């Protein structure tokens, strides 16, 4: 009866364990802990005591020599050495025996199997296993087990962290995999030139369009600005021309023509193509430059011709520019090209090479950030029937750049120039690059020459400048000669100016497409940027139209607070101190010591930072409408309110009935949990002294504009501009007869046709 014998042995060993548990182990543990030993050493001593009891209290010297605790997995070997017996190789470890004991409690067949396997074991091993179990129950959790569990937890935490990091970088890693150079038929020379420019893989737009363009198919590509559209057609066409191995004879006609709407974009594309090929001849033709140099280029021979429609057409008509051998035609920024009235010029240029049968026409590639329906209809006119559409934006996704934060600030026209300096200082700093877009040339010139709030150097860029002047301005801006570029729409499309931190639209964006391109001057090539739109109260509907068309959401913010301006100015001032040479500092230490003795170290340094940053006079402004000398107050309620009159009543109860003349522009918060209003800075202190917060109302000075409910007033036009309400009957100013379409007066409000004088 092996099972019965095993059970009796178990009972005997259990009695021994009970006796051992009565030994004064806790005292030994307390003494050892007092001497600075760990709980692991107690475990060792207890194992020795157990083995000594089993082996007539003769512990093995080996255990006394050990300073480090033995792991639980090695406890059986230690016990066997204590018993003075040689370990049997066939003997399983206590861990395995423990598993067999668990099986014993499940089924009788398992119990029989376990008993047969346990018969060859010595009594000493069994005793040690049971003693270990008793130790575990007495000391709750042995230290080695805790260490093992903690290690597992740490490993799991590291694995989770690695998973999170992998998820964040998954998109970038996938782009690198998809754009790996080995997946494309690129020559060694092209790869070398790309790597010299810091390009280690093709961007998504480049990888997705390469094979289509390389195979000779017609394609229409829509992608956001700043995603690398130039290389998406330049790289495959360079490889195609290199494969042709056509003799590069003098006077050869161009095989590729690239038409762009602006001169600046043409120059940029030319430089990009030249950077990846040294063998092929790339020429750039645009207006505002002498014809002679361009005629010499035609006689010398051209492979890539980049130009604007007007100048290219003139060269075709008057200087024998041969386009009959064109194999590839690229139209970049197609929507803008046709919006600017270049459609007739483009058709004249293409008619030289395009035939009635589309299959005989050259490969046509259209690229744009926006692709309206009319553009697809135009594509059918020049392209083969089986042309491809590659849309990297989609109809439902955001069409503007995703790396740009879109902000909107409401202020009147008279206040825009005054707050412009603070916006540039906070969002770009003294050393960042900013582009300010204006609607007119006069406005751009005026801001560049007489905007007193701008501390940074600024220059204007508009159509009245000669081409040479425009190139000098753009070159200076790229090289950091000045920090602020004030431009008209000439700089809105296609220009790849690196590291632009801020874009400011001096007026509300009227068209969604124009906003997409203007805001796309920042946040390029993986960088982040900010685009701020300044709008007047009556221009809110323009923002809503842009939001609906592009899928973005403007974040309504106020002008930077006094604290934010001081913080940004101080950061720039501290940064500028690093540029002062050490030998120069030595000459100023004596005067610095005198200043510290006079004013104190803290006051002296603060005054120096303010002067260095140019922030000697910082005006507090309203966050609601940018009016100087006003503070914005937030009065938060513990319960929702739906009427301003309720807030007025509570304010008058504490501050008196005359307070209504001191509070301006009150409006409800967006969540209806309070109101927001302006007070004059000279009245703020007295209000704070008289006001006492209650359970319902909390009075705070706002440091940033809270989300407020937009008022619908003034949506029918500018306030006090002389436009009436309901009447729409025209009139003539000279004879007061209603036969002109310029008016529209309010019926019964003014006898002079509805045009009222501003109050």
From Swiss-Prot:
GO cellular-component term (any): cytosol
Ranges of compositional bias, category Basic residues: 748-759
Chemical reaction(s) catalysed: ATP + H2O = ADP + phosphate + H(+)
A GO biological process held by the record: rRNA processing
Record-level Gene Ontology MF annotations: 7SK snRNA binding; ATP binding; ATP hydrolysis activity; RNA helicase activity; rRNA binding; snoRNA binding
Superkingdom of origin: Eukaryota
All copies of domain Helicase ATP-binding, residue ranges: 210-389
Entry-linked Gene3D superfamilies: 3.30.70.2280, P-loop containing nucleotide triphosphate hydrolases (3.40.50.300)
Tissues with expression: Widely expressed. Expressed at higher level in stomach. Expressed at higher level compared to ddx21-b.
Renumbered ranges of motif DEAD box: 332-335
Annotated SMART domains: DEXDc, HELICc
Residue interval(s) of motif Q motif: 179-207
Cellular compartments annotated: Nucleus, Nucleolus; Nucleus, Nucleoplasm; Cytoplasm, Cytosol; Mitochondrion
Domain named Helicase C-terminal: residues: 422-566
EC number(s) per entry: 3.6.4.13
Keyword set, alphabetical order: ATP-binding, Cytoplasm, Helicase, Hydrolase, Mitochondrion, Nucleotide-binding, Nucleus, Repeat, RNA-binding, rRNA processing, Transcription
Stated family: Belongs to the DEAD box helicase family. DDX21/DDX50 subfamily.
Name recorded for this polypeptide: Nucleolar RNA helicase 2-A
Source species of the chain: Xenopus laevis
